[in-house]
C-alpha cells in the first residue's frame, strides 16, 4: 500500500517506525500521540488494514489503533522526510532493512533501534549494524520493561533511551514520553543493549525452571545468577555496571520473567515441559529473540573470555544439543565458588 499524496499535505516531517510487528506497532501507536507517525509494513494488505481499519490482526488481535496512525508498504514513503527513524525489525533481518533505509534517510536524522538481539554472523549489536550502514546518523536504543499489551492498555510504565549524544537522547525522550510512559535517558548504549539481549536468554532459562515445575526459590536463583552473567559480559564490553541494576537490566528481566505474555518465557516453559525447540518454533508466528540470540551471546562471551554457564546451557537446549533436565543437572553440578568471584 502506497500512501495517497493528500495524506502528506501539511506534514513536513514525521516519525518513521520501520516494522509493523507487535512492538513496532505499539511504539508507533504511542508516539503518534505526540507527532505525526508513519509505520512501515512489509505486506501491503497489513499496511492497508492498519491505515484503514486501525487494526493489526496479525500481531495485535483485538487491539484498536490510533485513527491518525498511517502505514505504508513502500519504504521510501515512510522514511523520506522523517525527523526520526525507529527500527523495529528482528535481528535476523535487521541489516537488510537498515541497508534499504539508508538509501532514503537524510543525513543526521536520528536512528533508534527497538530490537533486542545480536547479528549472528558478526555478533554485532543492532546499533552497531545501523551505524555501519548509516555512519552519519546518530544511533540510539529504546529499551526497558515494556510489554506491548500493557503499553497499549495505557498502564503506567517506564523505558530508557540510550544515546551517546545527550541532545539527541533528550529529543527522543520528549517524543516518546506520555502521561503513562516515563522515559529516562542513559548514555550507556552498550550496557542497555547488552542487557536487552541477555535478558531474553535469562527469560528462556526462567521459563524452563517454571516448565519443570520448580518454585520461586529456583526461579529467583536463576534470575539473580543470570543478572550476574549479564553484568560480567556488559562490563567486559565497556558498559557501566549500574546499567544492569536499572530499567534496561533488572527492570526488563523482572517484567519478562514474570510475564506469561513474554514469548521468550513461553518458549522456556515449553522446553521445560519436554517439547523440542523445533516443534516450538514451528508453532510460533513470531520467533522469540532469545532462541536466536543464545548462541550468539555465548560466542560473544567466549570472545571476551567471560564465563556464562546459564547462557551456555540455554544455548545448548536451543540448539538441540541437550534437554532441559540435563542442562539443569550441569548447572547444579558446577564447582563451588564465591558468589562474587
Q: Which sequence ranges carry the predicted segments?
A:
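NAD(P)+-binding Rossmann beta1-loop-alpha1 motif at the extreme N-terminus of oxidoreductases
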Residues: 3-63, 70-73, 100
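Hydrophobic anchor at the start of a short beta-strand
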Residues: 15, 37-38, 137-139, 183
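Rossmann-like NAD(P)(H) cofactor-binding subdomain of soluble oxidoreductases
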Residues: 65, 71-156, 172
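Internal alpha-helical scaffold of NAD(P)-dependent oxidoreductase catalytic cores
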Residues: 93, 104, 129-137, 156-243
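General beta-strand structural signal in soluble alpha/beta enzymes
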Residues: 113, 138-143, 183-187, 246, ...
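NAD(P)-dependent Rossmann-like dehydrogenase/reductase catalytic/cofactor-binding core
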Residues: 199, 206-210, 235-245, 249, ...
Amino acid at each position: 500500500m502506497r500512501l495517497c499524496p493528500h495524506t502528506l499535505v501539511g506534514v513536513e516531517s514525521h516519525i518513521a517506525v520501520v516494522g509493523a510487528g507487535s512492538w513496532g506497532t505499539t511504539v508507533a501507536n504511542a508516539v503518534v500521540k505526540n507527532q505525526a507517525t508513519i509505520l512501515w509494513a512489509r505486506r501491503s494488505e497489513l499496511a492497508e488494514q492498519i491505515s484503514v481499519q486501525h487494526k493489526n490482526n496479525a500481531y495485535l488481535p483485538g487491539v484498536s489503533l490510533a485513527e491518525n496512525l498511517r502505514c505504508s508498504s513502500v519504504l521510501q514513503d515512510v522514511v523520506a522526510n522523517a525527523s526520526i527513524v525507529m527500527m523495529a525489525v528482528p535481528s535476523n533481518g535487521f541489516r537488510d532493512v537498515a541497508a534499504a533505509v539508508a538509501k532514503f534517510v537524510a543525513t543526521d536524522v536520528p536512528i533508534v533501534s527497538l530490537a533486542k538481539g545480536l547479528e549472528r554472523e558478526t555478533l554485532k549489536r543492532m546499533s552497531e549494524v545501523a551505524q555501519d550502514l548509516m555512519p552519519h546518523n546518530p544511533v540510539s536504543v529504546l529499551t526497558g520493561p515494556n510489554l506491548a499489551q500493557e503499553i497499549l492498555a495505557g498502564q503506567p510504565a517506564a523505558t530508557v533511551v540510550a544515546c551517546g549524544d545527550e541532545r539527541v537522547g533528550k529529543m527522543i525522550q520528549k517524543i516518546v514520553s506520555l502521561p503513562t510512559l516515563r522515559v529516562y535517558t542513559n548514555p550507556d548504549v552498550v550496557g542497555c543493549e547488552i542487557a536487552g539481549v541477555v535478558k531474553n536468554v535469562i527469560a528462556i532459562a526462567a521459563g524452563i525452571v517454571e516448565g519443570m515445575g520448580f518454585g520461586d526459590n529456583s526461579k529467583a536463583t536463576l534470575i539473580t545468577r543470570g543478572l550476574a552473567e549479564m553484568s560480567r559480559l556488559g562490563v567486559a564490553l565497556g558498559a557501566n555496571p549500574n546499567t544492569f541494576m536499572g530499567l534496561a537490566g533488572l527492570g526488563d528481566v523482572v517484567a519478562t520473567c514474570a510475564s506469561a505474555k513474554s514469548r521468550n518465557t513461553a518458549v522456556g516453559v515449553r522446553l521445560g515441559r519436554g517439547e523440542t525447540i523445533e516443534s516450538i518454533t514451528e508453532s510460533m508466528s513470531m520467533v522469540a529473540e532469545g532462541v536466536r540470540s543464545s548462541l550468539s551471546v555465548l560466542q560473544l562471551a567466549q570472545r571476551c573470555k567471560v564465563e556464562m554457564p546459564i547462557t551456555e546451557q540455554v544455548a545448548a537446549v536451543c540448539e538441540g544439543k541437550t534437554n532441559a533436565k540435563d542442562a539443569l543437572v550441569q548447572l547444579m553440578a558446577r564447582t563451588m565458588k564465591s558468589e562474587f568471584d
